[in-house]
Curated annotation (Swiss-Prot):
This is Putative dipeptidase TRV_05564. One of its GO terms (molecular function) is metallodipeptidase activity. SUPFAM superfamilies: Metallo-dependent hydrolases. It catalyses: an L-aminoacyl-L-amino acid + H2O = 2 an L-alpha-amino acid. Disulfide bonds join C96-C186. Zn(2+) 2 binds at E157, H228, H249. InterPro entries: Metal_Hydrolase, Pept_M19.
């Protein structure tokens, strides 16, 4: 009888492997490997492209960018493969103006530079097409994973990058961008940034022009990214969006009270919205009181807190690799993802929950955003034409009599 009990106990410590032998419940490395074989690990935010811009001026054909062997930062092909990555949202980041107090309508080159970043993203993926696959929809992302490639998607990190223009946003979408973070570390014509509140200024949330942006992003099927925005902006957007939102690289405010993180009331609303919060690894965000002591378990704590408050359907991963110099011990570069999943399983997550975390959740959100967009478009909703009233620009701040009848040519074109 004792022998039978021991045998039964041994059986309970095993979990089935699809089409293979059983694996001990406590063999977290093998269980993590199984998770990453069955679901694509999709990271919500990586700034490698900005590092390329700063180091090579977006020149990738001269042999000076050894992406296929080893780069100095956090990301290259060998480490992505070691990290079992199945998909990456590449940020086409361009920094805010150097003066955060500069008027929003000050002329700048951010939109031009953003298009150049989209261009280098597409060229990089094409150059390494044996390993990477450019995708602009979730079906393609799944196909890339089945074919053993790393799905590569594009996200814009801040409304300043499209000049606070809905028409410019639309063209960025047509060029391939599939999410836009509403702000970076500067306010724009649509919303207040978290950095503004950190600087001691009031949290004004969305502007009167903000709803027009959300309406158009919903219509296009463009993911609304609420990382970097103020807490009130988060709440304002969640009240009006018709589609799920993402936080491409944010963590839990209750665990670490940094304004870049998401408070519990917003986490609960994200669950109702069916969105996803993709946990970032930046040490000063995940452990604001002692960043140097942050480690992989610190990040696991954020993952579990979001899962407890919002549910396992609403948590994902967005490391912010190559966008920070502060990373927890054990998560030094993109190769460390399997170790993180080991720790998540060791902390008590099921493999089903881990699959949701690594990629199934963000793919579900992306799919729903597309479905809602198709429904909106079928209903006959036209592109938003509204422009920001505070902008500078030829013929937009003045009204001519052209549409009312013959008028003198007020603006020369020759």
């Amino acid at each position: 009888m004792a022998a039978l009990f021991v045998s039964l106990l041994a059986l309970t410590s095993l979990v089935p492997v699809q089409g293979a032998a059983t694996v001990p419940q406590t063999d977290y490395a093998k269980r993590a490997e199984r998770v990453l074989k069955s679901a694509p690990l999709i990271d919500g935010h990586n700034d490698l492209l900005y590092a390329i811009r700063r180091s090579t001026n977006d020149q990738i054909y001269d042999g000076k960018l050894p992406f296929e062997t080893s780069l100095k930062g956090h990301t290259d092909l060998p480490r992505m493969r070691k990290g079992r990555m199945g998909g990456q949202f590449w940020s086409v980041f361009i920094a805010c103006p150097s003066d955060p107090n500069a008027p929003i309508n000050t002329p700048k080159f951010a939109t031009r530079d953003t298009l150049e970043q989209i261009d280098v993203a597409r060229r990089l993926v094409d150059k390494y097409s044996k390993d990477l696959m450019y995708c602009d929809n979730p079906g393609c992302a799944k196909r890339a994973f089945r074919e053993g490639k790393i799905g590569s998607f594009i996200g814009i990190e801040g409304g300043h990058q499209v000049g606070s223009s809905i028409a410019a946003l639309r063209q960025a979408f047509y060029a391939g961008a599939r999410y836009m973070t509403l702000t970076h570390n500067c306010d724009n014509a649509w919303a207040t940034a978290a950095s503004t509140v950190r600087a001691g200024k009031p949290d004004l949330g969305m502007t009167d022009f903000g709803p027009a942006l959300i309406k158009e992003m919903n219509r296009l099927g463009m993911l609304v990214d609420l990382s970097h925005v103020s807490h009130q902006t988060m709440r304002d957007v969640l009240k009006i969006t018709k589609a799920p939102v993402i936080f491409s690289h944010s963590s839990a405010y209750e665990v670490s009270k940094h304004l870049r993180n998401v408070p519990d009331d917003v986490l609960k609303t994200v669950a109702k919205n069916n969105g996803v919060v993709m946990v970032t690894f930046v040490s000063s965000f995940v452990k604001v009181d002692d960043p140097d002591s942050a480690d992989v378990n610190t990040v696991v704590k954020h993952i579990f807190h979001i899962a407890e408050v919002a549910g396992w359907d609403h948590v994902g991963l967005g490391g912010d690799y190559d966008g920070t110099t502060e990373l927890p011990k054990g998560l030094e570069d993109v190769s460390k993802y399997p170790y993180l999943i080991e720790k998540v399983l060791e902390a008590g997550a099921t493999e089903e929950q881990a699959r949701k975390l690594v990629g199934e959740n963000v793919l579900r959100v992306w799919t729903e955003v597309e479905q809602i967009a198709k429904k909106i478009q079928r209903s006959g909703v036209l592109p938003v034409e509204e422009v920001w009233k505070g902008r500078n620009g030829t013929a937009l701040s003045e009204r001519s009599t052209f549409i009312e009848g013959p008028a003198p040519l007020e603006y020369g074109c020759d």
